[in-house]
Amino acid sequence: MFPSFEVIPAVDMQDGQVVQLVGGERGTETEYGDPVAAAQRWVDAGAETLHLVDLDGAFEGERANADAVEAVLEATDVSVQLGGGIRTVDDADSLLSMGVDRVILGTAAVENPDIVGEINDRHPGSVVVSLDAKDGEVVVSGWTESTGLDPAEAAARYEAEGAGGVLFTDVDVEGQLSGVRADEIARVVDAVDIPVIASGGVSTLSDIEALKDAGAAATVVGTALYEGEFTLEEAAAVV
């Protein structure tokens, strides 16, 4: 999935605009403009993968930024992974046929673990399971409902179901530029043999190095890039 450690820019979409949330909570968003412009900016800066999230889909359960997603796919030629509102095999089929390379399942995987294997059987290697952790437990439905699941145990479970990778988001530090908690990532990495993508809290180049040292295969970075804490080129240089 990732031949070497990769820094992946986030393009989180709400109401057709790029936003970043603080702690995964609605109403805390800062807007950063047009998704296509943002995506092109990161591709021009050297991004090999884009991380797209339909936040309306994550919160409401139905994808609401399809036009923006399609526009990004048409405007760029890099790998794209997409999450938010993917609830069925048909949803995944549609996105993968549209040109998305990997679909990210969160709520759907918790509610119906079999969906991971069903999609993987049809599209091998295309499923990443999103484990969003808040107060040490996996949360779903736009980070509003706790499942009681331990992230490391859940990661191992979804690997057995056929997941090709895990996206671990530390919601407690998401969007806050407060630094990463590499020990939380290391717990998940140690539980599985598939790639683990780390997300949440990256604020410095040292954070990126810490995630790499913890065993993550890649990290998704949003607010730090949009706020100019460092450039994508600088991030690539340290890994």
Swiss-Prot record:
GO molecular function, a single term: 1-(5-phosphoribosyl)-5-[(5-phosphoribosylamino)methylideneamino]imidazole-4-carboxamide isomerase activity
Top-level EC class: isomerase
Active site, renumbered: D12 (proton acceptor), D132 (proton donor)
Substrates-to-products reaction catalysed: 1-(5-phospho-beta-D-ribosyl)-5-[(5-phospho-beta-D-ribosylamino)methylideneamino]imidazole-4-carboxamide = 5-[(5-phospho-1-deoxy-D-ribulos-1-ylimino)methylamino]-1-(5-phospho-beta-D-ribosyl)imidazole-4-carboxamide
Gene assigned in the entry: hisA
GO biological-process terms attached to the record: L-histidine biosynthetic process; L-tryptophan biosynthetic process
Name this polypeptide is given: 1-(5-phosphoribosyl)-5-[(5-phosphoribosylamino)methylideneamino] imidazole-4-carboxamide isomerase
Source species, domain of life: Archaea
Keywords assigned: Amino-acid biosynthesis, Cytoplasm, Histidine biosynthesis, Isomerase
Localization annotation: Cytoplasm
Enzyme Commission number: 5.3.1.16
Source organism of this protein record: Natronomonas pharaonis (strain ATCC 35678 / DSM 2160 / CIP 103997 / JCM 8858 / NBRC 14720 / NCIMB 2260 / Gabara) (Halobacterium pharaonis)
Pathway in which this enzyme or protein is active: Amino-acid biosynthesis; L-histidine biosynthesis; L-histidine from 5-phospho-alpha-D-ribose 1-diphosphate: step 4/9
